[in-house]
């Protein structure tokens, strides 16, 4: 069970650019997840944003009015009982940032697919994001029909029918569709009830060896800090199994690239956990759920500017091997989604360059051999992954990487 300061479940906020993912996240959590200056300037999410909220229930009101994220009941002002804390992962909706969305999907226990009622459905990245959730095995999905305040009742019903038609035969075929206005905060109680009903906290085995997907890494020191005040590098990510404690030794793989003569190999990094935290709250032990900040003894130079994002961290000696080459069983989609002309997807070819997402890592690989049921791929950047893990596969089509399917590591 996650500590009380910690979220129990990670929910992805996905969908086409400008359909209101970040606005909805803000309404639910009070946090505007576009915090990087470039994001504020361009009005789009570039990196994964994270924000937590507590779902609460009024002890006297009926459903769904009893659900809120506020400090008191929205209907009667009465006392609230906290049901659980959840963490939202706000993924970029822009087509050029698909790799970031795919790396975020590996952290998601469920997802909210945001679709604007004011535009035709499906838009290109609505399709691509739904396929990505399917490819990476995210099955617990709620559809939010946002911006209903901008359309007439007839247009909202027509858009609802388009959503039903679009999701037919997909992983979201039976997903609830909740009409919402994130701008006005309308129907959020119904959405909170749906989150409680349709995205349960997964069963977690806390006795297994811990694994942490690293999604971000930072140097938290300000320029000009005194040497005595310097802090070690910080990594941020989600624990996917087991538990980490302050004082534990931590191994981070693939680690550092070392060149000796004309040979290059990767050396895992070993460090110690100095602190664990969620936002500004400190933890002694961290469990799966939410984004965890892990303070280490590492040289901050190793962690600055997300240098370790895409790594896997755990107790030394328990992590899978680092792969510079991988064999996968490909499962390709029939057509390319996300582009205007939905081309038929050809089988993988020998010497083809592919983009692969494994866990939170993004790498490029060249197929050494390719058959319909098996492909061997040499990776430009190695990844630390287990047999049986899913790999999202993207192919360069025109000037963009497009998701074409997934593979299982053999």
Swiss-Prot record:
Top-level taxonomy: Archaea, Methanobacteriati, Methanobacteriota, Methanomada group, Methanococci
Chain residues that bind GTP: 18-23, 146-149, 181-183
Function per UniProt: eIF-2 functions in the early steps of protein synthesis by forming a ternary complex with GTP and initiator tRNA.
Binding sites annotated in the UniProt record for Mg(2+) 1: 22, 45
GO MF entries: GTP binding; GTPase activity; metal ion binding; translation elongation factor activity; translation initiation factor activity; tRNA binding
Annotated positions binding Zn(2+): 58, 61, 73, 76
Gene name of the record: eif2g
Residue ranges the record marks as coiled coil: none
Keyword Magnesium: yes
Subunit structure: Heterotrimer composed of an alpha, a beta and a gamma chain.
Protein name: Translation initiation factor 2 subunit gamma
